[in-house]
Amino acid sequence: MQVHHERPVHISAAVITVSSTRTKENDSSGKEIMHLLEMAGISVGIYTIVRDDIEEIRREVLTSFRSCNCVIVN
C-alpha cells in the first residue's frame, strides 16, 4: 500500500498580457484570466501589459517569478 502525503501549496499567479495596443482598461482577456484564477482560489500577485517585444516579455517573465510561482502569458 502506498501512502501519499500532500500539503497545500499557495499559488500566486502573474498575468502578463502581451500587446502593443491594449491597456488595463480594455484588456478583456487579462481581466477574464484574473477572474477565473480568483474564482479558483488563486491569488493574482502581478498583472501587467508588456509590448510585443521578446526581450520585454522575457524580462517580465523572469521578474514575475521572483514573487509568483505561476506565470501566465496571454
What are these regions (language model features)?
Residues M1-N74:
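Non-catalytic beta/alpha edge segments that cap or flank active sites
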